């Protein structure tokens, strides 16, 4: 939220983030990019303070792919003066969804879902009505829950095209998958679970947030993974 708050109010103060079971969550990408947009960044007693009278667009090349870094700076840049170009950005569907949402409010964002996002700053944003797409990680979790219990599940109002990396691994595990434009059915009844090797990677690779669920599935498989 740091980028959107400093862009709108000129000042933001938030606690330094912690982490999760995977590890700590560094925020260097976020802070370095905000400084390039003109924000003054200070670390005080476990808090990050960012301030700026007016952010100014620039070109930013992320040193590594970061979903939250891309989203944070995209939200900051929509209210910055002039054009901002973000390179080496995350291409996750959620980044595209955020761009669509911001554009529905009056932002001018193009290129979301590619390696480069271009943002033309606007003076302000307006309210809008927006339907949030289904969560592919949540859907994948339900699919694996059915797989480990040798069940049958149908998930509706989902976009299977966003989940090819997950569905391909489920097929390799022995699940039968039937997918249409907005529905996925998994059948694992009376089947043996096969081991599947997993390597996580930025989209369109296999999502990190699905590795724990697949660990459970692989733990019940016949073989090594």
Q: Can you say where each PLM-predicted feature lies in the sequence?
A:
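Short, structured segments at the rim of ligand-binding sites
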Residues: 1-225
